[in-house]
Amino acid sequence: MAGLGSPLGRLTAVTSEIYDFAAIQARWLPVWTELDPFRASDDPSDPRERRYMLDMFPYPSGDLHMGHAEAFAIGDVVARYWFQRGYNVLHPIGWDAFGLPAENAAIQRNLHPADWTYRNIETQAASFRNYAISFDWSRRLHTCDPEYYKWTQWLFLRLFERGLAYRKASPVNWCPNDQTVLANEQVVGGTCERCGAQVTKKTLTQWYFRITEYAQRLLDDMALLEGRWPERVLTMQRNWIGRSEGAYVDFTIEGRAEPVTVFTTRPDTLYGATFFVIAADSPLAAEICAPEQRAAFEAYVDQVRRLSDIDRLSTERQKTGVFLGRYAVNPVNGERIPVWAADYVLADYGTGAIMAVPAHDQRDLDFALTYGLPVRVVVDTGEGDPAVTGVATEGDGVHINSGLIDGTDKAEGIARITRYLEDIGKGRAGVTYRLRDWLVSRQRFWGAPIPIVHCPGCGEVAVPDQDLPVLLPDLRGADLAPKGISPLAGAADWVQTTCPRCGGSAQRDTDTMDTFVDSSWYYLRYCSPHDPSQPFDVAKVRQWLPVHQYVGGVEHAILHLLYSRFITKVLHDMGLVDFVEPFSALLNQGQVINQGKAMSKSLGNGVDLGEQLATYGVDAVRLTMVFAGPPEEDIDWADMNPGALGKFLARVWRIAGEVTSPVGAPPKDGDPALRRVTHRTIREVTELVESFRFNVAVARVMELANALRKAIDTGPGPADPAVREGAEALAVMLSLFAPYTAEECWARLGHQPTVAKAGWPTPDPELLAQEEVTCVVQVNGKVRERLRVSPSISEEELRAAALAAPAVEKAIDGRPVQRIIVRAPKLVNVVV
């Protein structure tokens, strides 16, 4: 029993005469903290079905903002619903705490990154508690804690052992402002996604994860996610992985012993190749350049290195190049074609070289017309000559000027020419991917050190597991400003070490890991966040994972989500997890915008979350977030009215306080009409919450509140047991969206905390049967669905219900709806 000094011991009857959200919040927050009602059980004998609800963990850049308020309100609806249904729910919280923003912010304030980061974490933690998110706080983690990044380093070493972590010198994306490298996924429109600086190229020796080894599996396993992840995200990942089928073709370069291989999706156009292009910044171009062209080539390469990949691939920009003074030999006709270095071919894409077919590729045509190179049509599409029109003909047609495959169509031409190349030993069928290996090195301080030692005799040597973590040196007072090399390189005592293999003098690797490595496995650590002996408890992971519902922004589609899928597959191959996809279902929430635009300081349209919470209260803000519309859509805060929702909450609070029937009064003795309304609402809200139509669920809760208000004022009155039944159901359902008010209502109705564990109400089928009729839904006169609806359903409600039915959506199949005939409550006919 709670002591008198505890919040529970001090609870007294509600005596306030007005709805005071601040007083209600102050009353219940310490009670919840003491009760800790959302702690998940790891007990394998616990008979409850398990559910894992996960929000993408936040970055501690400051206090919570409006985007956090929306995303976490959405995830909390799911978690609280599962708690009410009696599941054993894991709903953890942590912080993605390493990274550039914290380091830069700390440098600007003359602080150590750790001080800045942990201060922000505590601020956000207090705000999350106030915002009443149903977290299991016992599982809290921070990726910048040595107890966490020890296991991030352990993960790196497991990839290193399997040949999936490796080091190579190559051109990388370089942010001149942050003075560090960027993965391809972190370059947006040619600029750094973090600071907006124009990205350039720089050749560095860097660490990579061999994600390309898993490219096909990443594609194939998307079948497991169909219908459970947004199609937009799956499409983005498919496009980013970029599988292409075609052929590898070997070209002999005169004066070079080894052939140069290109990949093409159209080997049938080989007869139209009139020149050969190599990426200007590739080692191959420098190798084969003729002496007489060397000066021109080197001057040209200096120009190209100033361009971003986005610039080089732009269709708007004129293509440039330089002749290398060499010729390649076309393997199908023996023709000598000139070899050029150009900016529109990238060294790290494909093989870094292409056969140029200007008649049938627009970039090749633009280049050919600029430099007066031949244009030969080899596919007759019935269109004009590209050399005259300036437009390449890229469609299908009949092959002409193509020797062995004249007169064939595309499919037959590809098959024949590929077989011929295989027969003569000059090519083979193949597949290539757009996906590049994951660049994980960063030249900054605030990250997990790479656990590798560089020994003059032994080379790259892994730090033994028993010596993990490789701790960051403190470096307090050191200049951490970006200089193009890691600040760790200046920590001489830290850098100098002993080789674990030979015992000789060696140096630590001075780069730190991309923070996406930290977040690629955090969902596993939550299962045993304080285990000092292993990254995660395998048995517990098998109990909880994969995550049942993941909530977060679409901006992570080709970053965190792809990387986590890759790491999960690696761990599966190691036998540590028994699933291949980490997140069974994904919901991408929309953005919170203002006046039609994303919030930003430059536009002056930012909305301060703290001010909104102080003005309207937590529940009104949370309710606004879920009532604004479908969770996937943006919320324009300028159009929202949290004050009106605050008034609704006050009405619910008053209803709970006016109920006079005793706790446990038999509902069957109550007004049957009101009971039917209550049970219909329970059924509909259940269906709506399970289909993530939270805004409509809130509308149904509002309708029940209106029915209760009417019943109290002009109906059976506050003593009727049906009023109590409805008010109790209202409090439980409202707890998903407005937990403080719901808890207060639960107390006013005579119950002990907490309403979150009251149990979800079950609709009585007998009451529902008494008030339902069957509505036939037709599409173009053909019956596609039968709905059970209320006899009093409005035309608008019936129209919405019919259009939302999956069978009707499938029958419409995206076609424009011409008109909808509604004869409530028994018929809807959709004409498309």
Swiss-Prot record:
GO cellular component, one term: cytosol
Motif ('KMSKS' region): 598-602
Catalytic reactions of this protein: tRNA(Leu) + L-leucine + ATP = L-leucyl-tRNA(Leu) + AMP + diphosphate
SUPFAM superfamilies: Anticodon-binding domain of a subclass of class I aminoacyl-tRNA synthetases, Nucleotidylyl transferase, ValRS/IleRS/LeuRS editing domain
GO terms, biological process: leucyl-tRNA aminoacylation
Isomerase found in the keyword field: no
Claim: Nucleotide-binding is one of the keywords in the record: yes
Alphabetic keyword roster: Aminoacyl-tRNA synthetase, ATP-binding, Cytoplasm, Ligase, Nucleotide-binding, Protein biosynthesis
Cross-referenced InterPro entries: aa-tRNA-synth_I_CS, aa-tRNA-synth_Ia, Leu-tRNA-ligase, Leu_tRNA-synth_edit, M/V/L/I-tRNA-synth_anticd-bd, Rossmann-like_a/b/a_fold, tRNAsynth_Ia_anticodon-bd, Val/Leu/Ile-tRNA-synth_edit
Motif 'HIGH' region location, chain numbering: 58-68
Location of the protein in the cell: Cytoplasm
PROSITE patterns in the record: AA_TRNA_LIGASE_I
Residues where ATP binds: K601
MF term (GO), any: ATP binding
Top-level taxonomic group: Bacteria
E.C. code: 6.1.1.4
Pfam families attached to this UniProt entry: Anticodon_1 (PF08264), tRNA-synt_1 (PF00133), tRNA-synt_1_2 (PF13603)
Primary location group: cytoplasm
Record PANTHER family: LEUCINE--TRNA LIGASE, MITOCHONDRIAL (PTHR43740:SF2), LEUCYL-TRNA SYNTHETASE (PTHR43740)
Similarity field: Belongs to the class-I aminoacyl-tRNA synthetase family.
Protein name: Leucine--tRNA ligase
Organismal lineage: Bacteria, Bacillati, Actinomycetota, Actinomycetes, Acidothermales
